[in-house]
Amino acid sequence: MARKRNENSLAENRKARHDYFVEEAMEAGLVLVGTEVKSIRNGRVNLKDCYADIYNGEIFVKNMHISPYEQGNIFNVDPLRERKLLLHRDEIRRLDGLVSRDGYTLIPLSLYLKDGKVKVALGVCKGKKNYDKRDSMLEKAHKRDMDRAIKEKNKY
């Protein structure tokens, strides 16, 4: 059975939890221009290969693809442009300290609406090795089999 999608969830980076260990997640605002919000509300956003970097005390998301809005004409911007994240200075410093450790990076996990504003769930992640991915897939399969067996047993 497919997972129910949250009503105010706009996009989700499903590969992030497969490719990375998510150590910590936090909410950040996103600076958008013009018709990007309309395009995001239509679900025309891709988080698959995006990541965040810290420059001069500011965090920017790279490779987040927001398709141009069809009725946007001259107000459309570059779909892959860098977008600034809105966080407090002390939060940025703390994230900078976490990411400076070897192997850690900032990955956007999902986009959602909160009080009419687009927010990003930003995760501090460490990359998985291939054997970690296989182990997590096996754990998922075992859990699914156990749930199926319990459901069958409780059926009668």
Swiss-Prot record:
Keywords: Cytoplasm, RNA-binding
GO cellular component term, pick one: cytosol
InterPro entries: SmpB, SsrA-bd_prot, SsrA-bd_prot_CS
A GO molecular-function descriptor: RNA binding
Compartment list: Cytoplasm
Keyword set includes tRNA-binding: no
Predominant localisation class: cytoplasm
Functional note: Required for rescue of stalled ribosomes mediated by trans-translation. Binds to transfer-messenger RNA (tmRNA), required for stable association of tmRNA with ribosomes. tmRNA and SmpB together mimic tRNA shape, replacing the anticodon stem-loop with SmpB. tmRNA is encoded by the ssrA gene; the 2 termini fold to resemble tRNA(Ala) and it encodes a 'tag peptide', a short internal open reading frame. During trans-translation Ala-aminoacylated tmRNA acts like a tRNA, entering the A-site of stalled ribosomes, displacing the stalled mRNA.
Family: Belongs to the SmpB family.
Protein name per the record: SsrA-binding protein
